[in-house]
Each structure stands twice: as C-alpha cells, then as structure tokens.
Amino acid sequence: RGAARPGAQGRQAWRSWVTAKPIVPREQANRDIDQAISYYLSEDAEQAALGFIDAVEQAYAHLSLHPATGSPRYAHELNLPRLRCWPLARYPHLLFYVERPDHIDVWRVLHGQRDIPAWMQEPDDI
C-alpha cells in the first residue's frame, strides 16, 4: 500500500549523485570560531560551546552539499557579488563564504549583532 520509501541504501545511492565540495576556512574564520568557543567557556557554558561546534559542523556539512542555499544579502550591501551567508542553527552567528569551483571558501563566522560591514574587511580576491 502506498509508495515505497527509499531506505538507507536508496539515500546512499542518491547521495552518490551529489558531489560535496570541501570546506576551506580562512584563518580569520578559524579565529572567529575559537573566540566564540572561548566566550562560551568563559561564561561556564560548556554545553553551549559544544553545541556551537556542532552547529558549525552542521553548517559546513550542509554548505558542502548545497552551497547556493546561503543568502546573498550582504553581497549586495558590501558589493561582494559572490559572498553568501548562512545562519548557524540555535546560535546568533552567521557564516560568510564564497563558493569556488573546487571548494567553499569560508571567510568569517560572526555574531549577527556585530557591524558586519566593518568586520568583513578582506582582500579583494573574491
């Protein structure tokens, strides 16, 4: 009765058609992540720090498979045509990246309340 649903093997076969791009964070993005983790730990919020790490890993996994899903909102504001951002689940941070032909170039991971244009000062190699 009803249509058959794909099982684990069906999902794996489907995933083989999708090519994941490697995530390559810039040094500044890694520093942003380290600073956020340090902040949560300084507030005795170890679970929040661990959750933040999970949220970053989930964002990386998603963007690796679906890089075009990020918002181009700041691309227009900053006049950086290919810049996209993706919100971290359950955290007020945005992951800023550019899709390259062979990888995802992660620029920054910033708290959404920051002055994003001021924090996005990067070389013009987009």
Q: What spans do the regions from the language model cover?
A:
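Basic, Lys/Arg-enriched alpha-helical interface segments
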Residues: 2, 9-83, 117-126
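Enriched for short, Lys/Arg-rich terminal
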Residues: 6-17, 88-126
